Amino acid sequence: MPATESIARRYAADIGFAVVGELTRKPEWDGVASGPEIGLSCYCRVWVDEGGNAYYVHGKECAIIDPEGMVY
């Protein structure tokens, strides 16, 4: 399992967020994730689960955005 996937899964587990199915890398979505609601302002690698939740990972930090735009 790639390190960024492991970080995304660990963060989701830590906050009680259920990962839906498999996580798939979305390199075309990689980039700077900025905004006060996201809490990250740096280059992130993005993973998406089968439920449409996006996991933005930078270093050991992660933010999850669900299909409705809620940030976790």
Predicted regions and their residues:
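Short intrinsically disordered terminal tails
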Residues: 1-6, 68-72
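Short, non-transmembrane alpha-helical segments in secretory-pathway proteins
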Residues: 2-22
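Acidic, low-complexity, intrinsically disordered interaction modules
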Residues: 20-72
